[in-house]
Amino acid sequence: MPVVTIHYDKLVKILGREVSFEELAHNLIPMLGSDVERIDEREMVIETEFFPNRPDLYSVEGVARALKGFLGIETGIPEYNVRRSDVEARVEESVLDARPCLAVAVVRGVEFEDERDLEHLMEFQEHLHWVIGRDRKKAAIGIHDFEAVEPPLRYFLADPNDRSWAFEPLDHPGEEMTPAEVLRRHEKGRQYAHLVSDGAPILADEEGVISFPPVINSERTRVTQDTTDLLIDVTGTDWRSVLDALHVIVCNLAERGAEILTVEILGAYERTTPTMELDVWDVPVSEARKLLGIDLSGEQLEELLERARHGAIFVPEGERELREYPLPDVYHIEADWREIPPILYEEDVVRVFVGPRRTNILHEWDLIEDAGIMYNYDRFEPTVPDFYTPSRADREREFINVVRDTLARMKFVEVNSLTLISPEENYRKMRLEPDGRAVKLANPIQKEYTIVRTWILPSLMRFLADNKHRPYPQRVFELGEVIERDEDAETGAKDRWKLALAIAGPGVGFSEIKSVVEALLRELDVTGWEITERKHRSFINGRCAAVLADGRELGFFGEIHPEVLTEFDLEVPVVGGEFDVAALRTAAGW
């Protein structure tokens, strides 16, 4: 999890109130849901770890904003000064198949008092890269000195070897490089080359290249201590991640009094960024009482949510005329706000307006958690239940842990992938036809995740494809759930635990995966098993086998078919297999 460096003098200045270093380090900051890693009383520095669901707290400005609410210094949605700029950015069709999403903002009036402020900004940027951007894959942030930028901007896909798009990358002044040379010679280029495919995404102004996302910015637009105005660009492959990253960073910079200016995105699509939209939620007072275990009134819940830096208004059950309650006028920007939804609960509720910096509010319970934090967990009175139940480890989980430990001793690395997948990867790329067993999502958000996986091996193939830049051989496994349709089940589907394993690298073959499977069966004390030939379209014919015990198939393994390797753009042989955990457990006598 990200570790945030907080200098006491910086925090107190933004906070606007004297608070002792000891109180901050030992009481207040931990109350925000963080784990203090290091306290340096001589340098007056606190290093604290925040959960990945709160990127808005990854800088001293975000921590100060939260503490203002906790201490009652300032409550409600922060008031930011937002207006339109005359800056435009044009997106060309060429980039849509590579890195299609672009969001841009200008932030004026930023003050860097000393080198620490610059270091904080860079640290904040990298934390967002890791948590929201998934190490720049989904979103990458570029921060520029706006005075060095000559709008309008142009975002397009260039030939990596075209010298007309050569530029001086950061930390290499005087060394003009093409995008291809950056990928070969620059340390950041080598680190992120795997995110760049055939062409090079380029963000340019009238003077030339200002950024080669997601790799490196131009030295020309370097931010220094004298910089007062910033241009912030966020590019990526996922719109939500891109907008979340932009909103979090501009809102935190605005905590120092900076002004946010929007930018018009034109060309392949049109939108104004940042959008600064609010989300609207209704929190039933009864639900908050039940989850927190305290007797809260509607007015008290409203106050707690305001202290959590949300907009909140208590709406009693009999006052439904407030269902058209307007959005708070806290963002000074002309915008077409979406229609405010009616209140659906037939009980007392608190209507909550959530600012765009809070990327983690996915359910009303998230808001109730915020209320609990503001109430102060130290005030909760623990109670001892008047009953107890003896516990023991679940036998299935015990067996799964034995399998996990056994494979770890065999030098395999465990992978945890999503249970959602696309039919493309679950079937076609594995040379299979859809069989109607997959559970489909009614309202998928992304085309990559429209069904629940029916087996795990495709997920491992995707993992190997994403890690081609890592050294070989690669030995990975996953223990996880798969779900299949079952008309006889109460829910219409059944879930099962599966084990999948794969080895990738030059020279791997059937004998290597066979020896691994045999060793695993011996370690699990499976008896009476035999290996027989099996046909499976994902494997090379004649190089696939099944493991049987008492006439029941435990799983299968073999050499992955070359067509499957091609579909996943893999250039080395892969062997793998998949086993039913319940069948393995039965055969092992658990």
From Swiss-Prot:
<keyword id="KW-0460">Magnesium</keyword>
<keyword id="KW-0030">Aminoacyl-tRNA synthetase</keyword>
<dbReference type="GO" id="GO:0006432">
    <property type="term" value="P:phenylalanyl-tRNA aminoacylation"/>
</dbReference>
<dbReference type="InterPro" id="IPR045864">
    <property type="entry name" value="aa-tRNA-synth_II/BPL/LPL"/>
</dbReference>
<dbReference type="Pfam" id="PF17759">
    <property type="entry name" value="tRNA_synthFbeta"/>
</dbReference>
<keyword id="KW-0479">Metal-binding</keyword>
<dbReference type="InterPro" id="IPR022918">
    <property type="entry name" value="Phe_tRNA_ligase_beta2_arc"/>
</dbReference>
<dbReference type="GO" id="GO:0003723">
    <property type="term" value="F:RNA binding"/>
</dbReference>
<feature type="binding site">
    <location>
        <position position="370"/>
    </location>
    <ligand>
        <name>Mg(2+)</name>
    </ligand>
</feature>
<keyword id="KW-0436">Ligase</keyword>
<feature type="binding site">
    <location>
        <position position="360"/>
    </location>
    <ligand>
        <name>Mg(2+)</name>
    </ligand>
</feature>
<dbReference type="InterPro" id="IPR041616">
    <property type="entry name" value="PheRS_beta_core"/>
</dbReference>
<feature type="domain" description="B5">
    <location>
        <begin position="276"/>
        <end position="382"/>
    </location>
</feature>
<dbReference type="InterPro" id="IPR004531">
    <property type="entry name" value="Phe-tRNA-synth_IIc_bsu_arc_euk"/>
</dbReference>
<dbReference type="GO" id="GO:0005524">
    <property type="term" value="F:ATP binding"/>
</dbReference>
<comment type="similarity">
    <text>Belongs to the phenylalanyl-tRNA synthetase beta subunit family. Type 2 subfamily.</text>
</comment>
<dbReference type="GO" id="GO:0004826">
    <property type="term" value="F:phenylalanine-tRNA ligase activity"/>
</dbReference>
<keyword id="KW-0067">ATP-binding</keyword>
<dbReference type="InterPro" id="IPR009061">
    <property type="entry name" value="DNA-bd_dom_put_sf"/>
</dbReference>
<keyword id="KW-0963">Cytoplasm</keyword>
<dbReference type="GO" id="GO:0000287">
    <property type="term" value="F:magnesium ion binding"/>
</dbReference>
<dbReference type="InterPro" id="IPR005147">
    <property type="entry name" value="tRNA_synthase_B5-dom"/>
</dbReference>
<dbReference type="InterPro" id="IPR020825">
    <property type="entry name" value="Phe-tRNA_synthase-like_B3/B4"/>
</dbReference>
<dbReference type="InterPro" id="IPR005146">
    <property type="entry name" value="B3/B4_tRNA-bd"/>
</dbReference>
<dbReference type="InterPro" id="IPR045060">
    <property type="entry name" value="Phe-tRNA-ligase_IIc_bsu"/>
</dbReference>
<keyword id="KW-0547">Nucleotide-binding</keyword>
<keyword id="KW-0648">Protein biosynthesis</keyword>
<feature type="binding site">
    <location>
        <position position="366"/>
    </location>
    <ligand>
        <name>Mg(2+)</name>
    </ligand>
</feature>
<dbReference type="GO" id="GO:0009328">
    <property type="term" value="C:phenylalanine-tRNA ligase complex"/>
</dbReference>
<feature type="binding site">
    <location>
        <position position="369"/>
    </location>
    <ligand>
        <name>Mg(2+)</name>
    </ligand>
</feature>
<comment type="subunit">
    <text>Tetramer of two alpha and two beta subunits.</text>
</comment>
<protein>
    <recommendedName>
        <fullName>Phenylalanine--tRNA ligase beta subunit</fullName>
        <ecNumber>6.1.1.20</ecNumber>
    </recommendedName>
</protein>
